[in-house]
Amino acid sequence: MRTFHGVAVAALAAAANAASLADVCTVSNVQSALPSNGTLLGINLIPSAVTASAVYNSTSSGGMGGMGGMGGSSSVNYPYCNVTVAYTHPGKGDKVVVKYAFPQPSDFKNRFYVAGGGGYSLSSDATGGLEYGAASGATDAGYDAFSYSYDEVVLYGNGSINWDATYMFAYQALGEMTTLGKTLTRNFYGLSGDAKVYTYYEGCSDGGREGMSQVQRYGDLYDGAITGAPAFRYAQQQVNHVFSSVVETTLDYYPPPCELAKIVNATIEACDPLDGRTDGVVSRTDLCKLHFDLSKIIGEPYYCAAQTSTSLGFGFSKRQAPGSTTSYQPAQNGTVTKEGVAVAKAIYDGLHNTQGERAYLSWQITSEFSDATPEWNNDTGAWELSIPSTGGEFVTKFVQLLDLDNLSTLDNVTYDTLVEWMNTAMVRYLDSLQTTVPDLTNFKSSGGKLLHYHGESDPSIPAASSVHYWQSVRSIMYPGVSASKSLKDLQEWYQFYLIPGAAHCGANSLQPGPYPENNMDIMVDWVENGVQPIRLNTTVSSGDYAGETQMLCQWPTRPLWKDNSTFDCVNDEKSIESWAYTFPAFKVPVY
């Protein structure tokens, strides 16, 4: 076991504060900065695995700029020390490789930054924190996550779950990377024992789920977390990607993509004015749900030209499998049918078992039907079932424990089958992937701040999923407390925002609405300067109002435009109730 020499580290500290990047970015300096084995419980460092090299001509796109507009889109040269370290878990014989990027000493602002990944991939880029003067890291999670996605390694073989990879992907790898990274950062820059290292997390989609896993399980490590559209409630969320296909097979109708698009666009047009301004954005999907009947669209004409489209094949979209795919759609000309509207209504209504008990929530009205898009069969000249691989692969690998990339058929699959799959996965992965622990006392008590947001028209992860978790936290942490007091106390450390018209972790091509672009600036101001947000700063990037700044309403207040330039944040109890769900199809609480 290595011995940690305080005198040597103190000397390194003084040198690091005054030295250039070239002076501190050496293998010996990094090895001296490693915590001694036994200091971090369950982590034994491998000093011989350390690498270090100074990087001067690399640019950073900045934080999570490519995932939902967070962190900006700057492309600036940030010199940094590119470090690789490795560790093992005592008794396991494994090896976890972690990359860290340390800004040159003159740029360091006593910050550590963690970026989330997406789909079944953890982030492999360690440079996201550079623009904030933050050290940052990325981990291979012990299963070479730099080269393989988690779904590729979840099974050793049929019937045999790789639990080590599962727990590492679920939360452990990022928690260990941050625990080690904060200690290493402190020593690398020679900070005094009482010096603060502000630690931030930022991510969307599964990156949002990963962030929630850190807040739930490593709350005292983080000062601020920004989580967008979290893919938590994993069992329900992933199986829900098969729900739209089961609706179509149950109703025996596969709407042409153009018919589905017409239903969405006509709904947007009809509900746009309900929020008080006609701008192409439905800021109040709750009012749309309460006051608009999709049946009014029956008989409306639609037309779409023939097209060939390509999917990149990543993330939690319809096509999860790696590798791009190409599909052909013929020209489509027709009118919206009652069968098409029936499919749309059933999807928006959400999954119920055959006893009529609700099992899960669904996408907000005006969301695209991403999981419902059928395939064109040239041989039969008809639209046919296309099972989304995001949901299908989860069922085969995570529920059935078969090493298959998708379901081959939905024969004999009913709504009850979906509920059974959800229940099986919920029980199996409750302490790993589910990520729904509602007691955030540790995070709150440590002074942590949570900024949680979700695109209201997200077609992948329902916006109501985030609303449900927010309400779960409120009810668990403030039992017996009045509504006004619990809300006031909660908003001091946990704020949730719905983004009008927004899609999954980004702006929506169908609705030219606002989107947040400087969440990290807001979070840093909140954490380091005590400036608590009241509303969320967003910018409209397209359409007639491009460039407009909108300060969004904090949940549970809802926007209502007074005129074309000003909106109020109002309390609308009936609308808020439309976002509330219980799930009696399950016999245990679903947070």
Per-range role (PLM):
Residues 1-21:
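Fungal secretory targeting signals
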Residues 14-111, 123-124, 291-405, 516, ...:
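Catalytic-loop region of hydrolases
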Residues 276-284, 301, 306:
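Acidic, glycine-anchored loop motifs typical of Ca2+
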Residues 167-170, 254-258, 329-332, 456-457, ...:
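Active-site rim elements
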Residues 3, 80, 84-277, 289-293, ...:
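Serine-hydrolase-like catalytic core of hydrolytic proteins
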